[in-house]
Regions:
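Conserved SAM-binding loop of SAM-dependent methyltransferases across substrates and taxa
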Residues: 33-47
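C-terminal substrate-binding/active-site "lid" region of AdoMet-derived donor-dependent transferases
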Residues: 100-141
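S-adenosyl-L-methionine
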Residues: 1-22
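Conserved SAM-binding loop
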Residues: 63-64
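Conserved class I S-adenosyl-L-methionine
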Residues: 22-34
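Conserved SAM/SAH-binding beta-strand->alpha-helix loop
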Residues: 56-58
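Conserved SAM-binding motif I beta-strand of class I
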Residues: 49-54
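Conserved SAM-binding strand-loop segment of SAM-dependent methyltransferases
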Residues: 69-79
Length: 141
């Protein structure tokens, strides 16, 4: 199942990333439990500086083990939805516990990839999987 999920996400992310300049600084919110987005983006954009932001020390420790052969950085903090202009790209998970509508209305970074339900199409969008009922939306400032 993990291989299927990784392939499906990779296809969607690869397609969306072609829609603009390659980001050099990326923040991934909540990517610690299973860092699929970090695994994919470090392969698609090997020159990019990637930071995983997660409030859980245990999740970050798991991510460190899975990403040991990468240069990914880790920040133990809760993402508050505020401005993240220091990054070219911010990635927000489906499980984001915050104001998703505010992310769409006022993107906190120049480009924001929002994992969302398949019926919530916003901006430039790609379906991840019908089986997962999931899509990724790309929002730009």
């Amino acid at each position: 199942m993990q291989a299927f999920v990784l392939r499906a996400h990779r296809r969607a992310l690869e397609s969306l990333l072609r829609a603009g300049p390659a980001p050099s600084r990326i923040a991934i919110v909540g990517g610690g439990l299973f860092p699929r987005t970090a695994l994919i983006l470090t392969r698609l954009l090997p020159a990019a500086e990637v930071t995983v932001i997660d409030a859980s020390a245990a999740n970050l420790e798991r991510a460190r083990r899975l990403l040991a052969d990468t240069t990914v950085r880790f920040a133990e903090r809760r993402y508050d939805g505020e401005d993240e202009s220091g990054y070219d790209l911010l990635v927000v998970p489906l499980a984001f516990d915050g104001n998703r509508d505010a992310l769409y209305a006022r993107p906190p970074a120049p480009a924001v990839l929002v994992h969302d339900w398949i019926w919530r199409r916003k901006g430039t969008s790609r379906v991840v999987s019908l089986a997962l009922l999931k899509r990724i939306n790309l929002i730009r400032r």
